[in-house]
Amino acid sequence: MSEPNGWVELDVPEPDAEEFTGPQPVVAVVGRPNVGKSTLVNRLIGRRQAVVEDVPGVTRDRVPYDAQWNGRQFAVVDTGGWEPDAKDRAAAIAAQAETAVTTADVVLFVVDAVVGATDVDESAVKMLRRSAKPVILVANKADNSSIEMEAATLWSLGLGEPYPVSALHGRGSGELLDVIMDRLPEAPKIIEDRPRGPRRVALVGRPNVGKSSLLNRFSGEVRAVVDAVAGTTVDPVDSLVEIGGEAWQLVDTAGLRKRVGKASGTEYYASLRTASAIEAAEVAVVLLDASEVISEQDQRILSMVTDAGRALVIAFNKWDLVDADRRYYLDREIERELRRIPWAIRLNLSAKTGRAVDKLAPALRKALASWETRVPTAQLNAWLTALVQATPHPVRGGRAPKILFATQAGAAPPRFVLFTSGPLDAGYQRFVERKLREEFGFEGSPIEIAVRPRKKVGPGGRGKAHG
């Protein structure tokens, strides 16, 4: 029967329990009525098959659907809304949901992130704990970043990290599928191998610092025009080269002499192309001329990379021209001019002679690994608790704000959210970031830390975050 929203209700016979226990792993989707379970199922399987309507009780039976993710095959079981102490028809629906739990390999417990945890959700948690099945807590309807941050309050259910998802819009669904693949007890069948393409590297720097010379060093041919005249490269030149036994997609970019806003003519368009190359890359190699003073324009280029959130390797080129005196002054310049990015990986090399060029590939790998690092929430909060106990926030106005908990909101670059009882001093925020890097690395990668001060929850409802 056609529904008002244009979706079609399928007459699917109820499967036997044996169908859930074969070699294909099974994921059961459970939760109280109308939290968006069927919408999530449709998102996971990549097509509209589960019946969806914005009223409770549309799904009554447990219905399996075939699905795949990154070449892995599994089954998703949609269930009706679970309620404690249900009667008559609702009791039968709840029983079907409990059967799906007992026959599944992994359970997705879906909670409405907008409403938050309810008494029914807490009762469902007790049922899930009795099943002893692996449970992934899904905070659905996280349609924007504000709701996504609020979803972290669902830690109170005691099921571990809540994964914010918008089943309707697809937000967070890829990350959730990755988590599901990690939790399945047996490796799903590999349908096809989809190798990752070469990592993209942008070579950036002001004119005549040796970007094209370095590119040609790797490519083994005169791939980019090299001239002693500054600015001979205008268009980005892509080259697929092998560095350290691995293929890399290198983008050589026009040298930047001026701010993009102040450049004109050819320089203006070259600057825009360079900015686009940085955005398209995963990691940037910023070349500086080691024989010259670190300039304001060098720092602007570094800012372009960090503002874009890309992994960063700083290569001091023309090291063959550096004598002992220049090394002394360069060390002082690094301390003074690059103090805001002490986390950047630094190399001293010579594209002309080949000195230390072999160190670039390990540096790129390390920077990218840091860029993609994820810290488990439990580990993050255990570390943070110890840090705050050892060095609490200074008292201001007779009170000291507390860091309630933290979560990593994303990677590439790593992004963290601190939920606090009040605003944190800028100095304490820098202290937390420094200690976070000391503990977990992130060498070669920027990290972002957002602070979410919260009001106390009053008797009338949920608290709200400032900002």
Curated annotation (Swiss-Prot):
Asked whether the UniProt record includes Mitochondrion among its keywords, one would answer no
Give the taxonomic lineage as stored in the record: Bacteria, Bacillati, Actinomycetota, Actinomycetes, Micromonosporales
Q: Which GO terms describe its biological process?
A: ribosome biogenesis
A Pfam family of this chain:
KH_dom-like
Stretches assigned to the EngA-type G domain:
25-188, 199-372
Q: How does it assemble?
A: Associates with the 50S ribosomal subunit.
> Which terms in the Gene Ontology molecular function aspect does this entry carry?
ATP hydrolysis activity; GTP binding; ribosome binding
Q: Which residues cross the membrane?
A: none
Alphabetical list of Gene3D superfamilies matching this protein: 3.30.300.20, P-loop containing nucleotide triphosphate hydrolases
InterPro entries (alphabetical): AAA+_ATPase, G_ENGA, GTP-bd, GTPase_Der, KH_dom-like, KH_dom-like_a/b, P-loop_NTPase, Small_GTP-bd
Annotated GTP 2 binding sites: 205-212, 252-256, 317-320
Tell me where in this chain the KH-like domain is found: 373-455
Q: Which family does it belong to?
A: Belongs to the TRAFAC class TrmE-Era-EngA-EngB-Septin-like GTPase superfamily. EngA (Der) GTPase family.
Query: Residues that bind GTP 1, according to the entry?
Result: 31-38, 78-82, 140-143
- Function as written in the Swiss-Prot or TrEMBL entry: GTPase that plays an essential role in the late steps of ribosome biogenesis.
Keywords assigned by UniProt, alphabetized: GTP-binding, Nucleotide-binding, Repeat, Ribosome biogenesis
Q: What is this protein called?
A: GTPase Der
Alphabetized PROSITE patterns for the sequence: G_ENGA
Is this entry keyworded Repeat? Answer: yes
